[in-house]
Swiss-Prot record:
Interacts with ARMC9. Keywords: Chaperone, Cilium biogenesis/degradation, Mitochondrion, Phosphoprotein, Transit peptide. Residues 112-168 are annotated as: Disordered. Residues 145-157 have a biased composition (Polar residues). It comes from Mus musculus (Mouse). The modification Phosphoserine is found at residue 133. Acts as a molecular chaperone for mitochondrial complex I assembly. Complex I functions in the transfer of electrons from NADH to the respiratory chain. The immediate electron acceptor for the enzyme is believed to be ubiquinone. Is involved in the initial steps of cilia formation, including removal of CP110 from the mother centrioles, docking of membrane vesicles to the mother centrioles, and establishment of the transition zone. InterPro entries: ComplexI_NDUFA12, NDUFA12. This is NADH dehydrogenase [ubiquinone] 1 alpha subcomplex assembly factor 2. It is found in: Mitochondrion. GO terms for molecular function: protein-containing complex binding. GO terms for biological process: cilium assembly; mitochondrial respiratory chain complex I assembly; negative regulation of insulin secretion involved in cellular response to glucose stimulus. Belongs to the complex I NDUFA12 subunit family. It comes from the Eukaryota.
Length: 168
């Protein structure tokens, strides 16, 4: 840190009236601060801030899970009070239990599928044509010439000649 940046920081802290209140630290080493609403030297009201000072200072080193969920909720203002260390540890223990239970369930389900596959015969290949609600009796495709008349009339197929319109 250069000498000028130190001078600038001390001048800025004297003018800003921003007072950081240390609220807590998590088990990963991140520090959390609260800055109450205040008026700056120009008379503007600056709203409250909630700040995290990460243990690893580079943004590039950030990975999901570096900030516990409870602290993240406090920073985003979805929770009013900062979490306690006991609460964070209790929730992490609960997440681990859920992970173990889901893994057990997955293994039991996989075992159940293997035994049911042995009991059931393999499905036969079916031919699907048309809409599911319409019965298919092996009808032929429409022919070029129309067939029959009246109620059993089926039109013939049609192909356009060329893209030019005929004028009348």
């Amino acid at each position: 840190m250069s000498w000028w940046s130190g001078v600038w920081r001390s001048v800025w802290s004297a003018l800003s009236r921003e007072v950081r209140e240390h609220v807590g630290t998590d088990h990963l080493g991140n520090k959390y601060y609260y800055v109450a609403e205040y008026k700056n030297w120009r008379g503007q009201t600056i709203r409250e801030k909630r700040i995290v000072e990460a243990a690893n200072r580079k943004e590039v080193d950030y990975e999901a899970g570096d900030i516990p969920t409870e602290w993240e909720a406090w920073i985003r203002r979805t929770r009013k009070t900062p979490p306690t260390m006991e609460e964070i540890l209790k929730n992490e223990k609960y997440r681990e239990e859920i992970k173990i239970k889901s893994q057990d369930f997955y293994e039991k389900d996989k075992l159940g599928k293997e035994t049911s596959e042995e009991l059931l015969p393999s499905p036969t290949a079916t031919q699907v044509k048309g809409h599911a609600s319409a019965p298919y009796f092996g009808r032929e495709e429409p022919s070029v010439a129309p067939t029959s008349t009246g109620k059993t009339f089926q039109p013939g197929s049609w192909t356009p000649e060329d893209g030019k319109r005929q004028s009348q």
